[in-house]
């Protein structure tokens, strides 16, 4: 073999290895990174709407799940090695059941406040659907396929469930109640389960009533330590509440109660509902959410310690035995350091599948999109808006993701192909919530137009209106949304060459959805007068700094 051939082989081998290394390189957000790179971290660890988070450690691995409501795929699975740097790696459900029920957007319904546990070498997730009951899914591999959901307990208003297996093998399920369905809330109930955790065996026993001092107590998580049964539970409401700890030597009580985390003198409103996790080296930590309105319920991590068999979460700054949340702190000791990594946001649509950050508003129909191997774009078909709808609230084929930070820019490039239809195809960029605004390209008999559209009180059937309209030179346009503090102020702009962008319309105040934060994404639909044909190709979707 000649020296030249050897050099050529080495060159290509190096190129292949570099390409593989680049592909495997952790994604790092431009707009929010919790790891400060100096052994410290800042809260929130996730500035995204992973509401009602629950976290477990299995060996050296940490896994998180969160509420996903009607968004599909549902039950996100996030993975971390150091409790700070998280990657979205999977979902536990690909369809909500009953499948026919969730073919249409049931906003705010579906998956409420899940709990993840590791038992007998299997991973379990339990959640309450307020209309149908408590479900469970399990797997031996959290990165792989999860089994089909099992209805563990049927009933209305059953929410926020958490399993517990005692040392004697007995299995229990603690849960809360949704007043909107059950007619009562602010109580916690324990049911006995079969050892497999697939069904409850009794009507349950109420173990805590929060009506007197802890209204809206919900989201219970059960643990055992030093002979005490603990129920960690939030109370006081989503945006303004506090964290309770309940303890008893008997699983059915009576339970002592103590507030263990509150806002105090900090700016962190409603620091509650989450997970106690210990590290390999014996440290204790607590994850919880903070409701930030348009940004959703973002995830914080607090240091935790035990005093006289009570948890103290955060820092007890005023010595009242109640912790307050920290904004920065030393990273957990997990034995070694790991690279900075964040959940993916941008998507070049170069892979065979779209990124895991994307979710539909209902159970996915395969005809909504096509991501063909070897194609560097995502094709969204122009699906007809359901008859009688005045806005996008009940449109299932919206492809969106969570707000990734308080300040960011989202940019996409779209090409509209109406086929033989002369008007009524619509595709573009969307900031979705109970009020929403979109910047779209559409077609008319005389060409293509840019439109800024808006609906207020979309959840109350508010009519979508066209605010601005500009004639375009072609079927290609670049669309941008600039999102800023405070609370998601959005400015839309467009470009026909991808270089010079021009603002259009006035600023828009992003609004949360039903139990979720605002979402940003893309969509392609047909006006209700147009039944078929047409599609839009999206070349990329990028999240960058303002």
Predicted regions and their residues:
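Bacterial Sec-dependent N-terminal signal peptides
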Residues: 1-24
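Carbohydrate-active catalytic/glycan-binding domains of CAZyme proteins
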Residues: 21-546
């Amino acid at each position: 073999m000649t020296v030249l051939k050897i050099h050529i082989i080495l060159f290509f081998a190096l190129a292949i290895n570099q390409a593989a290394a680049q592909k495997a390189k952790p994604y790092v957000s431009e707009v929010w990174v919790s790891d400060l790179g100096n052994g410290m971290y800042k809260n929130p660890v996730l500035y995204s709407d992973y509401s009602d988070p629950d976290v477990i450690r299995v060996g050296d691995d940490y896994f998180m799940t969160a509420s996903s409501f009607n968004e599909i795929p549902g039950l996100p699975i996030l993975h971390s090695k150091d409790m700070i740097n998280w990657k979205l790696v999977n979902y536990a459900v690909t369809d909500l059941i009953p499948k026919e029920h969730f073919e249409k957007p049931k906003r705010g319904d579906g998956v409420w406040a899940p709990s993840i546990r590791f038992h007998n070498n299997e991973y379990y997730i339990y959640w309450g659907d307020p209309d149908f009951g408590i479900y469970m899914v399990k797997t031996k591999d959290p990165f792989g396929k999860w089994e089909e959901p099992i209805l563990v307990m049927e009933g209305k208003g059953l929410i926020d469930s958490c399993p517990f297996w005692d040392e004697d093998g007995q299995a229990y399920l603690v849960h809360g109640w949704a007043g909107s369905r059950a007619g009562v809330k602010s109580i916690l109930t324990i049911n006995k389960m079969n050892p497999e955790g697939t069904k409850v065996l009794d009507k349950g026993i109420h173990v805590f009533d929060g009506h007197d001092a802890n209204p809206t107590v919900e989201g219970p998580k059960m643990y055992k330590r030093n002979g005490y049964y603990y129920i960690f539970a939030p109370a006081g409401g989503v945006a303004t509440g506090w964290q309770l700890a309940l303890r008893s030597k008997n699983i059915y009580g009576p339970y002592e109660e103590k507030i263990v985390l509150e806002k105090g003198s900090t700016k962190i409103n409603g620091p509650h509902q989450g997970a106690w996790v210990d590290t390999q080296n014996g440290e204790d930590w607590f994850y919880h959410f903070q409701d930030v309105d348009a940004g959703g319920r973002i995830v914080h991590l607090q240091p935790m310690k035990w005093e006289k068999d009570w948890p103290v979460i955060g820092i007890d700054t005023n010595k009242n035995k109640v912790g307050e949340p920290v904004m920065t702190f030393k990273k957990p000791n997990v034995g070694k350091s790991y690279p900075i990594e964040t959940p993916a946001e941008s998507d070049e649509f170069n892979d065979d599948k779209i990124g895991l950050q994307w979710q539909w508003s209902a159970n996915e129909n395969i005809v909504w999109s096509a991501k063909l191997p070897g194609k560097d774009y995502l094709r969204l078909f122009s699906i007809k808006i359901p008859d009688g709808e005045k806005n996008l609230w009940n449109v299932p084929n919206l492809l969106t993701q969570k707000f990734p930070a308080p300040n960011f820019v989202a940019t996409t490039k779209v090409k509209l192909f109406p086929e033989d239809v002369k008007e009524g195809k619509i595709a573009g960029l969307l900031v979705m919530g109970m009020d929403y605004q979109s910047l779209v390209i559409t077609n008319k008999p005389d060409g293509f137009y840019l439109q800024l559209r808006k609906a207020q009180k979309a959840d109350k059937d508010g009519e979508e209106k066209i605010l601005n309209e500009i004639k375009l030179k072609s079927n290609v346009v670049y669309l941008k949304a600039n999102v800023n503090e405070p609370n998601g102020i959005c400015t839309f702009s467009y470009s026909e060459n991808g270089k010079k962008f021009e603002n259009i319309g006035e600023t828009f105040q992003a609004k949360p959805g039903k139990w979720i934060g605002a979402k940003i994404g893309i969509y392609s639909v047909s006006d209700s007068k147009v039944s078929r044909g047409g599609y839009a190709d999206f070349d990329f979707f990028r999240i960058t700094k303002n």
